[in-house]
């Protein structure tokens, strides 16, 4: 025996469902954040920003240090080689100094040619050093400065202020802004005291 009401009941159910109004579910607000949650998020964001800024600063410092190291390597990388070359320049100068002025004046053609050859070699050597950032300096007449000169002895000379370089035993050399070799000098003793440094034109005497 079949149920003759089955299809009819289904149609009625569908019609009833279509006729029923659609009721939307009410929106439920989320729970309020716990006390201090916003402050914690703000603090975390500030810490992350601070960490990022520190990292960027460290990277910039590293870049600058690297640039300086590369520049210093280019400028001062020849220091050891230059010191060895200076010994050759010194020997050439000693050879020239060993020939008195009178002997040069009266020298025959062969000796004059030899002297000129030594002088030319010394000049070429100094020029090669200068091309590589090494320059010669002669502090004659300057006030003694221990940063650039080494005093070998004192010379009684009242005609110049005490502490003045009056003799240069060996010239000094600079490489970049550094002293490659200090000048060996003789310093005046017993002369007048050096004049005080000017103070913007103001007389400070009592």
From Swiss-Prot:
The keyword Chaperone applies. One of its GO terms (cellular component) is cytoplasm. Transmembrane segments: none annotated. Its main location: cytoplasm. It comes from the Bacteria. GO terms for molecular function: adenyl-nucleotide exchange factor activity; protein homodimerization activity; protein-folding chaperone binding; unfolded protein binding. GO terms for biological process: protein folding. It holds the Pfam family GrpE. InterPro entries: GrpE (IPR000740), GrpE_coiled_coil (IPR013805), GrpE_head (IPR009012). Participates actively in the response to hyperosmotic and heat shock by preventing the aggregation of stress-denatured proteins, in association with DnaK and GrpE. It is the nucleotide exchange factor for DnaK and may function as a thermosensor. Unfolded proteins bind initially to DnaJ; upon interaction with the DnaJ-bound protein, DnaK hydrolyzes its bound ATP, resulting in the formation of a stable complex. GrpE releases ADP from DnaK; ATP binding to DnaK triggers the release of the substrate protein, thus completing the reaction cycle. Homodimer. This is Protein GrpE. The gene is grpE.
């Amino acid at each position: 025996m079949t149920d003759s009401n089955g299809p009819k009941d289904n149609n009625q159910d569908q019609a009833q469902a279509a006729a029923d109004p659609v009721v939307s579910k009410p929106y439920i607000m989320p729970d309020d954040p716990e006390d201090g949650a916003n402050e914690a998020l703000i603090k975390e964001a500030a810490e992350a920003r601070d960490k990022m800024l520190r990292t960027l600063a460290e990277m910039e410092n590293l870049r600058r240090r690297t640039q300086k190291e590369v520049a210093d390597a280019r400028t001062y990388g020849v220091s050891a080689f230059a010191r060895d070359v200076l010994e050759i320049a010194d020997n050439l100068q000693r050879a020239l100094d060993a020939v008195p002025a009178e002997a040069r004046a009266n020298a025959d053609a062969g000796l004059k040619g030899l002297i000129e050859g030594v002088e030319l070699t010394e000049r070429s050597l100094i020029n090669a050093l200068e091309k590589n950032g090494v320059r010669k300096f002669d502090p004659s007449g300057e006030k003694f400065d221990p940063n650039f000169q080494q005093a070998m002895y004192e010379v009684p000379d009242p005609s110049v202020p005490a502490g003045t370089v009056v003799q240069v035993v060996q010239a000094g050399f600079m490489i970049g802004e550094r002293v490659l070799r200090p000048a060996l000098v003789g310093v005046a003793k017993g002369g007048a005291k050096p004049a005080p440094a000017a103070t913007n034109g103001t007389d400070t005497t009592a």
